[in-house]
């Protein structure tokens, strides 16, 4: 193989899953065993967040955090929080494609593991299984971008970027 072919291969976009692991998990049952005697149907609240950090050149950790809180009336039946993580080797990817890769593709890979771990700990705790629904990480990513843009605009004091004839900033 020639040096030119090696260079071309070295410049190709590269994506590899190095490891998927459960970084942290906690279960709290503050009202057990009494909560098991309740007959009312519980309410369930689910929150999912995504974070990413660079560990080394081209090596990233992505963490999907899921929190499930179940209440019967005003009493917490249980609270589960899990951090499902993965280490990804991502090289030669254009900068504008890196953030969507970390915010959409990687969480999509990790989420089934998170769902399984949360469902498992809930049933092992003696509660009826809760199966988390699928998540559209593309939509979640776009919502985060929109919120960040709105926050940035708010930090600028509501300036629209338009300069008025008197030199002041137009407000929106």
Swiss-Prot record:
<comment type="similarity">
    <text>Belongs to the SecB family.</text>
</comment>
<comment type="subunit">
    <text>Homotetramer, a dimer of dimers. One homotetramer interacts with 1 SecA dimer.</text>
</comment>
<keyword id="KW-0811">Translocation</keyword>
<keyword id="KW-0143">Chaperone</keyword>
<protein>
    <recommendedName>
        <fullName>Protein-export protein SecB</fullName>
    </recommendedName>
</protein>
<dbReference type="InterPro" id="IPR035958">
    <property type="entry name" value="SecB-like_sf"/>
</dbReference>
<dbReference type="GO" id="GO:0051082">
    <property type="term" value="F:unfolded protein binding"/>
</dbReference>
<keyword id="KW-0963">Cytoplasm</keyword>
<dbReference type="GO" id="GO:0006457">
    <property type="term" value="P:protein folding"/>
</dbReference>
<keyword id="KW-0813">Transport</keyword>
<feature type="region of interest" description="Disordered">
    <location>
        <begin position="152"/>
        <end position="172"/>
    </location>
</feature>
<dbReference type="GO" id="GO:0015031">
    <property type="term" value="P:protein transport"/>
</dbReference>
<comment type="function">
    <text>One of the proteins required for the normal export of preproteins out of the cell cytoplasm. It is a molecular chaperone that binds to a subset of precursor proteins, maintaining them in a translocation-competent state. It also specifically binds to its receptor SecA.</text>
</comment>
<dbReference type="InterPro" id="IPR003708">
    <property type="entry name" value="SecB"/>
</dbReference>
<dbReference type="GO" id="GO:0005737">
    <property type="term" value="C:cytoplasm"/>
</dbReference>
<keyword id="KW-0653">Protein transport</keyword>
<dbReference type="GO" id="GO:0051262">
    <property type="term" value="P:protein tetramerization"/>
</dbReference>
<dbReference type="Pfam" id="PF02556">
    <property type="entry name" value="SecB"/>
</dbReference>
């Amino acid at each position: 193989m020639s040096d030119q072919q090696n260079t071309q291969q070295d410049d190709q976009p590269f994506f590899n899953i190095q490891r998927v692991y459960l970084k942290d998990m906690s279960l709290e049952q503050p009202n057990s065993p009494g909560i098991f005697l309740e007959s009312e149907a519980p309410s369930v609240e689910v929150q999912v967040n995504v974070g990413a950090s660079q560990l080394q050149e081209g090596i990233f950790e992505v963490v999907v955090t899921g929190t499930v809180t179940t209440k019967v009336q005003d009493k917490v039946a249980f609270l589960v929080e899990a951090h499902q993580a993965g280490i990804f080797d991502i090289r030669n990817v254009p900068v504008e494609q890196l953030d969507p890769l970390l915010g959409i593709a990687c969480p999509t890979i990790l989420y089934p593991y998170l769902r399984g771990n949360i469902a498992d700990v809930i049933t092992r705790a003696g509660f009826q299984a809760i199966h988390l629904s699928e998540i559209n990480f593309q939509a979640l990513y776009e919502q985060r971008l929109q919120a960040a843009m709105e926050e940035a605009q708010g930090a600028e004091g509501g300036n629209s970027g338009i300069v008025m004839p008197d030199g002041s900033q137009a407000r929106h």
